[in-house]
């Protein structure tokens, strides 16, 4: 008896049952066997680094435990035991290095926090430098005020014009009318100050006579060194001829700091103008005293260079 296999076309298959999918029909005919499970075998000679009390399979509880491990760069589970830090050496089978692309947020947070906090040493050093600077400024102001009271030598610092600030250089103009160049002196070392003071007393009478005959020239406007100061401008009625004259030396040592400090001690407003209240310069204001002395020095230097030209 012949049996003929019934062929059922695919388009006539039912949407359910054993003929629903071609994959099911192939799987029912092919002898498929499951793959064998992987088995791990402990190597002889390795130290026992796992405790029998805890679970051997890592779980989600190990994640927080690994995150708390700050001193090691590799991950390990809770069951790892380390007798001594200097004796324990991880084997290649257990070491899992940290991926370099994954950032370590714990270390980054500490580094950023350290950068945000200012250094206590740097703050203390800055405060000490500021205190030292204030003390030096006060000492220089006291020296300038003391020397200026004993030796008032200054040119006319105020201009009659209210719109421009300049300086009157009458001593340089009067030097042309004097036969010998005795109307000026040269700023030199401190050892020659006594001789210069004696010569200045002899010249005061001659300078007063000549300065009254010659009018003051127009004051220059340019300055090579700028300083912050506050001066009251007197009118023409209160202008009086200066009694002292100043002439800078022709040497090239004006840029030297020592020469600048020596000249600062010898420059000051005249006593008449200071008594009349024509200036708001105060002795206790060290910055104003220093800026005033530097202003006089550099203006006199510029005028001396222009006269030589």
UniProtKB/Swiss-Prot annotation:
Annotated compartments: Mitochondrion outer membrane
Disordered, as annotated region: 189-221
A GO CC term attached to the entry: mitochondrion
Keyword check for Transcription regulation: no
Matches recorded under PANTHER family: MITOCHONDRIAL FISSION REGULATOR 1-LIKE, PROTEIN OF UNKNOWN FUNCTION DUF729
Role summary: Mitochondrial protein required for adaptation of miochondrial dynamics to metabolic changes. Regulates mitochondrial morphology at steady state and mediates AMPK-dependent stress-induced mitochondrial fragmentation via the control of OPA1 levels.
Family: Belongs to the MTFR1 family.
Protein name: Mitochondrial fission regulator 1-like
Gene: mtfr1l
């Amino acid at each position: 008896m012949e049996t003929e296999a019934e062929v059922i076309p695919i388009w006539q298959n039912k949407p359910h049952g054993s003929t629903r999918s071609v994959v099911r029909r192939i799987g029912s005919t092919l002898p498929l066997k499951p793959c064998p499970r992987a088995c791990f075998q402990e190597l002889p000679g390795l130290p026992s680094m796992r405790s029998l009390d805890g679970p051997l399979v890592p779980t989600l509880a190990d994640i927080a435990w690994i995150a708390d491990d700050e001193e090691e760069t590799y991950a390990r589970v809770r069951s790892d035991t380390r007798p001594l830090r200097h004796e324990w050496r991880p084997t290649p089978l257990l070491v899992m290095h940290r991926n370099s692309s994954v950032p370590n947020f714990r270390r980054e947070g500490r580094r950023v926090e350290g950068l945000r906090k200012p250094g206590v040493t740097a703050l203390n050093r800055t405060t000490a430098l500021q205190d030292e600077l204030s003390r030096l400024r006060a000492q220089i102001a006291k020296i300038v005020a003391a020397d200026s009271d004993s030796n008032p030598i200054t040119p006319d610092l105020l201009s009659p014009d209210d719109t421009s600030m300049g300086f009157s250089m009458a001593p340089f103009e009067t030097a042309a009318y004097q036969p010998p160049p005795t109307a000026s002196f040269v700023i030199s070392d401190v050892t020659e100050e006594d001789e210069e003071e004696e010569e200045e007393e002899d010249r005061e009478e001659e300078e007063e006579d000549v300065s009254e005959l010659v009018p003051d020239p127009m004051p220059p406007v340019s300055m090579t060194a700028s300083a912050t100061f506050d001066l009251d401008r007197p009118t023409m009625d209160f202008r009086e001829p200066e009694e002292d004259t100043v002439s800078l030396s022709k040497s090239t040592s004006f840029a030297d700091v020592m020469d600048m400090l020596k000249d600062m001690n010898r420059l000051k407003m005249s006593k008449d103008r200071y008594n009349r209240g024509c200036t708001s310069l105060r002795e206790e204001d060290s910055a104003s005293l220093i800026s005033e002395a530097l202003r006089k020095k550099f203006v006199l230097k510029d005028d001396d260079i222009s006269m030589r030209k």
